[in-house]
Curated annotation (Swiss-Prot):
It is found in: Apical cell membrane; Cytoplasmic vesicle membrane. This is one of the three pore-forming subunits of the heterotrimeric epithelial sodium channel (ENaC), a critical regulator of sodium balance and fluid homeostasis. ENaC operates in epithelial tissues, where it mediates the electrodiffusion of sodium ions from extracellular fluid through the apical membrane of cells, with water following osmotically. It plays a key role in maintaining sodium homeostasis through electrogenic sodium reabsorption in the kidneys. Additionally, ENaC is essential for airway surface liquid homeostasis, which is crucial for proper mucus clearance. Originally identified and characterized by its inhibition by the diuretic drug amiloride. This is Epithelial sodium channel subunit beta. It comes from the Eukaryota. The keyword Oxidoreductase does not apply. GO terms for molecular function: ligand-gated sodium channel activity. One of its GO terms (biological process) is sodium ion homeostasis. Component of the heterotrimeric epithelial sodium channel (ENaC) composed of an alpha/SCNN1A, a beta/SCNN1B and a gamma/SCNN1G subunit. An additional delta/SCNN1D subunit can replace the alpha/SCNN1A subunit to form an alternative channel with specific properties. Interacts with WWP1 (via WW domains). Interacts with WWP2 (via WW domains); inhibits the channel. Interacts with the full-length immature form of PCSK9 (pro-PCSK9). Interacts (N-glycosylated) with BPIFA1; the interaction is direct and inhibits the proteolytic processing of SCNN1A and SCNN1G and the activation of ENaC.
Amino acid sequence: MHLKKYLLKGLHRLQKGPGYTYKELLVWYCDNTNTHGPKRIICEGPKKKAMWFVLTLLFTSLVCWQWGLFIKTYLNWEVSVSLSIGFKTMDFPAVTICNASPFQYSKVQHLLKDLDALMEAVLGRILGPELSQVNATTALNLSIWHHTPLVFINEQNPHHPVVLDLFEDNFNGSASSSPAPGRPCSARRCKVAMRLCSHNGTTCTFRNFSSATQAVTEWYTLQATNIFAQVPNQELVAMGYPAERLILACLFGAEPCNYRNFTPIFHPDYGNCYIFNWGMTEKALPSANPGTEFGLKLILDMGQEDYVPFLTSTAGARLMLHEQRSYPFIKEEGIYAMAGMETSIGVLVDKLQRKGEPYSQCTKNGSDVPIQNLYSSYNTTYSIQACIRSCFQEHMIRECGCGHYLYPLPDKRKYCNNQEFPDWAHCYSALRISMAQRETCIYACKESCKLLGTSPPLPPCLLPPVSPQDWIFHVLSQERDQSSNITLSRKGIVKLNIYFQEFNYRTIEESAANNIVWLLSNLGGQFGFWMGGSVLCLIEFGEIIIDFVWITIIKLVALAKSVRGPPPTVAELVEAHTNFGFQPDSAMPGPDAGAYRREQNPPIPGTPPPNYDSLRLQPLDVIESDSEGDAI
């Protein structure tokens, strides 16, 4: 009951309004505010009123302008960067090592036999008929060649370039690999390009190269990708270099280690790779001292004699230092350690800590990125490299109908190959150079808020070439092959030293350049300096604004009521106060009814009764209390 009464009073108060006009509110505000200036407008003479009005308006505008600048600066979400450097006990970084050759040629030769024979014929044609050693009667598998051939482009006439196939009689369907003698074009006078066709050869494009070496390498890699994409992953792993053959010796600090301390992982570009101190199943190993004696020492055998001849142009190891539980994108971020060299890597860990939203578009774990992370099956942390490659594979599947061999596959999808997807090479080439695809993926992917990097390695040193040092290779040969003879070639050995430098960490951390405290301090400083105001002055101004809005709403409601219908007439008001349901009491029948005179009813008033409450000089509750006192 009390709540209903309270709410009813509140409703009546809202309907009544402040009880002032606009002018009265302004005069009240100027007379009572603590802000300097407004009070002088109503207390001075006409000239001073005008002067103080102009000054107050000027300084108010100046304060608003300064406030706008500070708010704009704050909303730019600028950051300041702090740099700290030193040495402390840290987890030793994960080290991924791979052989530059992804497979052992002795195990993949049966898969690449036709491709290698065709490659030799191509090289013979490019080198020229006089240098070609290709047997003219050798039969080749020209299905590979017809699908994606290499061509000469003669641009002696730029307006009418001539496209010439490397094998002239291949146009007639002949299986002969003999180059046409006396062809008017060679690699010295013409450009070598790759012809990519789709829709049964009706739509073709040419991918040009500045060097015949690049053209042949790209062509061979594309054909090898088609072959390996059709081989099960278990067979590919068996064709790579096993850990016990690759890793000859291992030492971490004062503790010996071996290939069992490395986690195997298959990389499409480099075959079997091995990760030391990955931290997936075991705790990461720390390092508390700088120098080579407290780092990781490795001796690797590259097995250079078993390299795939046309697939690999570098002899050595590919390695990468990265954070624990992160996927090694070794092709993009790795470095080479050349065979026959000793390479030392002094590690300086760079840690970058970015501010999140709204200061930057970084992500903490990739959950807010709209791209499916295809590398999540490795149980690794998010990285922008993983996102960009997942995005490319997504576009590849959508545009070409199949996935590329170099990237993980989503469920229920297949890798591209010439048999099932004959147009995939043309589609892949177009997608690879598409700027729209790149911009889409770069826009969708976000950088990680935490990044870790390492410093570049020191220049490599040659391994000892003199004969007194052959005992090293004798011992290594005995340990690996149980042979008293040297079975390891000095040219195929890689020695690595990975250790912390004297300063092993460098932290780059972002912090907010302008926080909310900075903003409020500057806003209050400007308001106090130019107008002598404070937060309470702003509350007073807010109060007057609320009253203005209140009065305006009441006026609008009254205007709406007057528009909907005319005001009630006097007759309607009288009718409203007339009680037509009133009937006089009839006399009760009785023996002495005639003895009494019939009581006359008073006439019904034709005007509404007066509002007697308005005639009282005191409130109703005061009168009632006085009457109660008299009664007592």
